Structure formats: C-alpha cells, structure tokens
Amino acid sequence: MSKDWEEKFRPEDLQRIRGFRLMDDDFMSKCFEENIECTEMVLQIVLGRDDLKVEKVAIQHQLKNLQGRSIIFDIYATDHAGKRYNVEIQRADRGAGAKRARYHSSLIDANVTEPGEKLENLVETYVIFITEHDVLGKGKPIYHIDRVIKETGENFGDEAHILYVNGEYRDESPIGTLMHDFSCTNAKDIKYRTLSERVRYFKEDEKGVAAMCKAMEDMRDEAALAARLAERKEVASRLLKKGAMSFEEIAEISQLSVEEVRALAGKRGA
C-alpha cells in the first residue's frame, strides 16, 4: 500500500529505492553516512573483534597520491587506536583486483604520515573489499591477505592487511548472516537490527526517502555535468588536432578555460 507522502517524489525514484540493497555502493554510502554504529558492527563481524570501537567514519572520502591523482573510498574509518579501515563495495569483479587493493593500501599510508614522522609509527591499516561474487573462487567466506616471508612462512608484520569478503557466502554464522543482509531489498528481511533500521529509514520513512531522492538527483546532475565536460573536451581535442587555432580561440569555442585547453594539449604531446 502506497503512502500519501510518496506522491511528492518521482515514481521512478521510488521504484529504484525499493530495489536498492546494501550491496549497491550508492545506497550503502547513504546508509553508513555519519553512522558509526553500522560501520562498527560491520568491521566487528568481518574482523571477528568485539573490542573494535570506531571513532570516525567518512563516506565517499577522497585521498590523493603525491602526483595529485585522487581516488574515492566508499567508507574510510578510524578506530580508538588510530587504525584505519577502508571498506569498498564491489559488484563488478574487475573492480576488486589485487592491484587496486594494493593501491588503496598505499594511499592510506601516504595520507596518514606527516613530514619527518618516523615510519615505524605507521598505523595498522585494513583494506576490505566486500564483493558481490566470490572473486577469488575458493568458496571461503573471507580471504585474509598479508605479506609473509616465503622461506619461513612467517608473517612479515608490516600491519597492512587486505581482506576480501565473499558476498555469495551464506550460512548461520555472523559473516553469512551479514552477507544475506547486504543482499536484501526489504528491511524486514534483514536480520541485524542495526542494519534493518537504517535500511527501513531510507526506504520507508518520508525524511529518509527524501534524502535518497535528493542524493539521486545530485548524482544525475553530476553525471550530466560530467557528460557536458566530456563533450567540450572532445571538441577541444578535435580542434587541437587540426592545429589551426590558438588556445584562446579553442577555449572560446569549446567553452573550456584556456588552462584546460593547455592541459589537453600537454596530454596530446606527452
């Protein structure tokens, strides 16, 4: 039965919200936004640690490397001991490759160190990929990746951890239950109350639905802006290829700045 307030929103948005799961990163990001309780519960289950206490959590958190290239983390959390946790939701297998996990880990290290700080003080880090499919294909609920000394089999002890959580895994264990919950579209089917209440808010409460609709509107605006920028860059690239106009003329026609045109020209010449 529909609610009277649902008439305020676009039917296609409501339909999309009904189909969302925590395995959808846009929806998960909204559910975990500024929500320490949900983040803490997921980390406790994945890591098997009841003592873990999250102090800060950021959603869609941007980190940059030394060359200025940036990447956006789905969830970036800090616990009471200063340890860092990056949780990524990946529905596509290709987005959860080993090199990407390594890159995420390196970015955390680069961004938590201060100039002159001793490297021995590097904090312990965890990069956790929750994948819709069993990307490593061995049927395990969780895969723990740590550096080891090949000759002895001993842990190297650099405290940089990578974990893959198998979203297909189902049983009555905490991780099996969690992966079940991440695949539910209906809040009443979610077994962990902390997650169920959060999902219900964004699917069934007027204020929560309004927040989700606003988030989707913002995403549509961002996508439209990105498409326009791509079109302008394509126009500028074609004009640069012809080589008959100045940067200023190309900027005027393409509606890019002169600096953006220069940057495009630099990439062409690289």
Predicted regions and their residues:
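Pocket-edge structural micro-motifs
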Residues: 129-132, 166-167, 203
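Short, charged alpha-helical interaction segments and adjacent helix-coil junctions
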Residues: 2-18, 78, 85-90, 176-270
